[in-house]
Amino acid sequence: MKITNVSKVLSGPNPHHVDARKMYESPHAVAVVITLQPGESLKKHITPVDVFFYVLEGSGIVEIGDEKEIVGKDMLVESPAKVPHRWTNETSGVFRVLVVKVPKPAEETRLL
């Protein structure tokens, strides 16, 4: 058994310049916890594989393709491969999301 504590994982460099902590990586999947402080957002990007997002804390805006919704804690959002998406925190609180890419991408995410 392996247990990973998110507070012990260092935030890795990323093109969005936000707190992103890789919690799990295997040939089959990648899981990252992203924390957006008030006013922060991800750049719109395309992921080469399907992604699902689970909101851990707070609320924020998710954009996938032409759709835009406000989501909050304990909501799961599905995002198909190769569809532009991004997250935005327009609240005064922290917004944390678990990002799971399945399978692990063989190519890099592309910023738009």
Regions from the PLM with identified roles:
Residues V32-T47, A81:
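Conserved short histidine dyad/triad with adjacent acidic residue
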Residues V30, S59-I61, K68, P84, ...:
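Structural motif
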Residues E67-A81:
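Short acidic-glycine-tyrosine-enriched beta hairpin
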Residues L42-K44, V62-E63, S79, H85-T91:
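Short beta-strand His + acidic residue motifs that chelate non-heme Fe in jelly-roll/DSBH
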Residues A81-A106:
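Ligand-binding loop in jelly-roll beta-barrel domains
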Residues M1-H28, V77-E78, L111-L112:
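A short, N-terminal "cap"/entry segment at the start of jelly-roll beta-barrel domains
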Residues T35-Q37, T47-V62, V100:
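Short, conserved beta-strand element in jelly-roll/cupin
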